[in-house]
Design a protein with these regions (language model features):
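N-terminal flexible segment immediately upstream of the FAD-binding catalytic core
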Residues: 1-48, 52-55, 64-95, 247-252, ...
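N-terminal glycine-rich flavin-associated loop
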Residues: 5, 25-58, 75, 81-125, ...
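Short, conserved charged micro-motifs
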Residues: 42-45, 107, 221-225, 272-280, ...
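Residue-level detector of anion-binding/catalytic polar loops
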Residues: 55-56, 118, 236, 292, ...
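Short, ordered loop/turn segments at secondary-structure junctions
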Residues: 62-64, 124, 245, 404
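Conserved glycine-rich FAD pyrophosphate-binding loop
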Residues: 69-76, 81-82, 126, 285-447
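A generic structural motif
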Residues: 95, 259-269, 361-369
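C-terminal substrate-binding/cap subdomain adjacent to the FAD-binding core in PCMH-type
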Residues: 136, 155-316
Length: 447
């Protein structure tokens, strides 16, 4: 088997070393081979071999998100795309770039920044993420407030289907031709429908200036009012991030002397005249809403601050018994959900909840990183997580778990109960992957 793939891929592009196999394990399942293709044709040949030999495939980049998703059933081979790391085409004048999936986000930004352009994606753990992995998980960060998510930034892609067919979804222009945009189908599908082999992104000019206003409050109630006031104004904000005191203390290197129970950060990008007006109005609004402390960060310090936030990985391999939950809520529920989570944490002596929220986008990340291990049994831990999910559900929100111990990674625990549209998802999965080549179990409902 190894000889066959070495002939196809090359001698240093097939691995069965125990150390590397463990690196690409998922939920305790360890592959027997790691394959490192460098072309679309090689991916197609691997698909044919998997179908012929009845093998189950896992698609990965750097496998930095190995703890994301529910437990898989079986795993034979892993395809790592981190050596498909070329920039295929860059049309600078049209603000478009076509890349291979193994290009990392820092590598791409460094290349684009030379021409005063950038890709506005800043997901958690960005320094280790490949673009293919970011698109496959549809992960985003604070910049989604102004620029949107992968679904807004991806113009098209090439995908290798389970039957080895190569398709082109979407296009290379911002205004695509009429028809179904199949690229949206593969974004966020966790590699369960096909192998993303090339991606075309829409780019943006690098902002001339950026400044960040950081305000602290002792009471949370003023913060939703501040966010609503800024949202109702004509002020253009690129990022709006809420952090509670526990998050600041546990995960930030520096609080810059800004003491307080609740922290809100607003980032503004643009030209000097617009920036001056916007920052002054934001400062005034923050004071009117009772801010305890306010500090302004210039471009250099602002960039450093946001890079620190997006580079956080929070949980490493030493703390994989902890949970990272992500919550999406209706606009009107932001304040009440945060208050409910804070009350749940304050009334429970066995856990401490760190909260980071993309406040303008109504996405809340909750980190349960301080379980009292002596008193918190696995069953009780699961019960607490389900209580948190019920709090969210009661306010018309949804919660998924990004990281959990292997004992808690069945689909219902990670994703919650499948929605009304699950039967459509199941039909799509069956239609695209008739022979179940891609590992089953990691996605919603065990897909």
């Amino acid at each position: 088997m190894i000889d066959r793939f070495e002939k196809l891929l090359g001698k240093k592009k097939v691995s069965n070393s125990p150390e590397e196999l463990k690196k690409y394990s998922v939920a305790g399942k360890i592959p027997s081979l790691i394959l490192f293709p460098t072309s679309i044709d090689q991916i197609s040949e691997i698909m044919k071999s998997a179908k012929r030999d009845g093998k189950k495939l896992l698609i990965a980049g750097n496998n930095s998100q190995h703890s994301f998703g529910s437990a898989i059933e079986t795993l034979d081979w892993c395809i790592s795309l981190n050596r498909m790391n070329k920039i295929v085409e860059h049309e600078a004048a049209d603000l478009i770039i076509n890349i291979e999936p193994g290009v990392t986000l820092p590598q791409l930004q460094k290349f684009l920044n030379k021409g005063q352009q950038f890709l506005p994606l800043d997901p958690m753990g960005a320094q280790n993420r490949t673009l293919g992995g970011i698109v496959a998980t549809n992960h985003s960060g604070p910049l989604r407030l102004l620029y949107g998510t992968c679904r807004d930034l991806v113009l098209g892609m090439k995908v290798v289907l389970p039957d080895a067919t190569v398709i082109r979804a979407g296009g290379k222009t911002v205004k695509n031709v009429a028809g179904y945009d199949l690229s949206k189908l593969f974004i966020g599908s966790l590699g369960t429908l096909g192998v993303i082999a090339e991606i075309t992104f829409k780019l943006f000019p690098l902002p001339a200036r950026s400044e960040t206003l950081w305000a602290t409050y002792n009471q949370f109630d003023e913060i939703p009012d501040l966010i609503q006031s800024i949202g109702a104004s004509n002020l253009v904000v690129s990022r709006c991030e809420y952090l509670n005191r526990i998050f600041i203390e546990k995960y930030m290197d520096n609080d810059y002397g800004l003491k307080g129970m609740h922290h809100i950060l607003f980032d503004v990008q643009g030209n000097a005249e617009m920036m001056k007006t916007t920052v002054e109005k934001m400062h005034q609004l923050a004071l009117e809403k009772g801010a305890q402390n306010i500090q302004l960060f210039s471009k250099k310090d602002s960039t450093k601050l946001w890079n620190q936030i997006s580079s956080l990985t929070l949980f490493d391999k030493k703390s994989e018994s902890d949970h990272h939950c992500q919550i999406s809520i209706p606009k009107a529920s932001f304040g009440s959900v945060i208050n409910s989570i804070e009350n749940f944490s304050n009334n429970n002596m066995l856990l401490s909840l760190a909260i980071q929220a993309h406040a303008g986008s109504r996405i809340i990340d909750v980190f349960c990183g301080d379980w009292n291990k002596e008193q918190m049994s696995p069953d009780r831990c699961r019960s607490q997580i389900e209580s948190l999910r019920q709090i969210v559900k009661n306010q018309n929100g949804n919660m998924v778990i990004w990281q959990a111990p292997d004992s808690s990674r069945e689909p219902a625990m990670i994703w919650g109960e499948p929605g009304y549209d699950f039967h459509l998802m199941k039909k799509i999965k069956t239609s695209y992957d008739q022979h179940q080549i891609f590992v089953a179990g990691r996605f919603i409902g065990g897909l």
